[in-house]
Regions:
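A conserved mid-protein helix/loop that constitutes part of the nucleotide-sugar donor-binding site
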Residues: 16-27, 191-210, 217, 227-230, ...
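Aromatic "clamp/platform" in nucleotide-sugar-dependent glycosyltransferases that forms part
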Residues: 250, 269
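Short hydrophobic beta-strand element within catalytic cores of glycosyltransferases
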Residues: 286-289
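Glycosyltransferase donor-sugar binding loop
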Residues: 38-45, 189, 216-230
Length: 360
């Protein structure tokens, strides 16, 4: 049996969620017998060791700053590899893939939307116009699919929602680590920037402490907006939270951190389809999150009381306190339910099979 050639295109292989999904997809396709090549053009190589470990071929076509230079380099790479299908992730790579197809290269094209569109500016309209030359447009969230269907009717028939997968063998629970302590251990995994609402959580934690509850917060993620990060540090100092709220750099092996804490929190103002929320649930961890994008779908009806308004410090603090009042038995029950939900929604097998159906 002759398997197809699949080229996976993305701007860079930095430490983000979209990059993790792309290299994961590439490794799963290779495992299914496809001839896979990952191509990227920005100098972010975080996931290269993963590709090497999985035996997935990759090619860095860097050194191009202008769009025309990137186009030529990626065009030549696609021509050389001769893929039957191209799967692109992220807006810039999606647009490049559409332009290369317009330039005469013949391949099945699947473009994947990895974020939640906030406004239809000129660049976004151009991107969606180019998507008309793809075979499928694959948002990773139902919220983004709804937005595109509502605002870009020409793309409705191309839309197929494929939500993210989680490595359920890597992200697993250890219920023996759950214990009833006075101090609630809360975890956040996100870059430090405005959209992630770090300042909002800091203010909510201050309110929780003022209500007489003990809490420790560990935030794992790099600072992508230095001014905002400095504002966060100043707020921590102003509220005397230096022994409560801790910042840590992002780390490749975050799975163990999920198993050390009592509760995961995602306070973002908006999201695409958040990998870390799915990972936390896969680890059997209770979660609270802002009621935006697909968070309600991810968490399910059993967790409706743990959704909050990210613009309301009071609502966020009340949600934390509501969880803090629960017994250890109830917390364990929530964690087990979350694990079962993750097994049903976020399996690798379901994820890759949906892409294979589109490739064929």
């Amino acid at each position: 049996m002759v398997f197809m050639k699949v080229l996976c295109l993305i701007d860079g292989l930095g430490s983000g969620g979209a990059q993790r999904q792309l290299v994961g997809l590439a490794s799963l396709l290779k495992k299914e017998g496809y001839d896979v090549l990952v191509v990227y053009y920005h100098g972010d190589h975080f996931f290269v060791p993963f590709l090497k470990e999985k035996g997935v071929a990759y090619r860095y076509v860097g050194g191009a700053n202008r769009v025309d230079e990137k186009f030529i380099k990626v065009f030549k790479t696609i021509k050389s590899f001769g893929p039957d299908a191209v799967i692109s992730y992220m807006g810039g790579a999606n647009m490049l893939a559409c332009l290369i197809r317009l330039a005469g290269r013949r391949f099945h094209l699947i473009v994947s939307e990895r974020s939640l569109t906030q406004r239809l500016d000129l660049k976004t309209r151009l991107k969606f116009f180019l998507y008309r030359f793809s075979d499928y447009v694959v948002p990773n969230s139902h919220a983004e699919s709804d937005f595109i269907a509502r605002n870009i009717p020409a793309l409705r028939k191309k839309l197929v929602t494929i939500t993210n997968f989680v490595d359920l063998d890597r992200f697993y629970p250890d219920y023996t680590l759950f214990r009833e302590e006075k101090i609630l251990r809360l975890l956040c995994v996100a870059s430090v920037r405005r959209v992630k609402n770090t300042l909002g959580l800091i203010s909510a934690v201050k309110r929780v402490i003022d209500e007489g509850y003990a809490i420790r917060v560990d935030w794992f993620g790099d600072s992508l907006e230095d001014d905002y990060y400095q504002d966060c540090l100043q707020s921590v100092e102003k509220f005397h939270l230096q022994d409560v709220f801790y910042f840590h750099a992002s780390m490749a092996d975050i799975a163990g951190e999920y198993r050390k804490v009592d509760l995961f929190c995602m306070p973002s103002l908006y999201e695409g389809f958040p990998n870390v929320l799915c990972e936390a649930m896969a680890c059997g961890l209770p979660v609270i999150a802002s009621n935006v994008s697909d968070n309600a779908y991810i968490m399910g009806k059993d967790n409706e009381e743990f959704l909050f308004d990210p613009c309301s410090v009071e609502d966020m603090a009340a949600c934390i306190i509501r969880f803090q009042k629960l017994s250890l038995e109830k917390r364990l029950q929530i964690g087990r339910t979350n694990r079962e939900s993750a097994l049903q929604k976020f399996s690798r097998e379901n994820f890759v099979s949906q892409y294979i159906r589109l490739i064929k």
